[in-house]
Regions:
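Nucleotide-activated chemistry modules centered on ATP-dependent adenylation/adenylyltransferase
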Residues: 1-175
Length: 175
């Protein structure tokens, strides 16, 4: 096993966890104060235990203090609507994936692992700049350039829909 996965505990990352469990040595969740962290991180832990994958939680409390996003402001602040709607921009936590991938990369290299898995997907692109293919490619290049072991990103959901991820999850008997 040569990989680390960034796992929130949501549908996308849990599906990725199961789909590539045979490659994953370590799972990392980040507690950055998002409204959903207290629900999703325990799911991540449960699924990692089921798969016998070591799971760690990295606290990023500073993000809630210094970053602005409705995801950090309490559930009443989060707008409802479609991903592409303008009002959904308030849910962006600036450079969240960049921060998490940077930390995950350092942890991966420190543990002799070769790649970092992340479950960003096509539906995220409309609103989250750090989920777009261009960002993932640039971050992959930066990580490879900045590590002795050429640590890369594996993001197989980048160009597929959430519906497709749900279909994959269903095939894996995830509900």
């Amino acid at each position: 096993k040569d990989s680390l996965i960034v796992v929130s505990g949501g549908m996308d990352s849990i599906t990725l966890l199961y789909e590539y469990a045979d490659r994953i040595a370590l799972a990392v969740s980040f507690d950055y104060g998002a409204n959903h962290n207290h629900k999703e991180i325990p799911f991540a832990r449960i699924h990692c235990e089921r798969l016998k994958i070591k799971h760690i939680v990295i606290p990023l409390a500073f993000m809630k203090e210094y970053f602005r996003s409705s995801l950090l402001d309490g559930s009443d602040s989060v707008p409802e609507g479609h991903y592409a709607d303008e009002n959904m921009k308030s849910t962006v936590v600036p450079f969240r994936n960049g921060i998490m991938l940077s930390i995950a990369c350092g942890i991966a290299e420190s543990n002799g692992l070769k790649q970092v898995l992340i479950a960003n997907h096509g539906g995220d692109h409309a609103i989250y700049p750090d989920c777009r293919s261009e960002f993932i490619q640039a971050m992959d290049k930066a990580m490879r350039s900045g590590t002795y072991e050429n640590i890369g990103i594996f993001a197989p959901y980048t160009d597929i829909s959430k519906t497709e991820i749900a279909s994959r999850g269903k095939k894996l008997n995830l509900n």
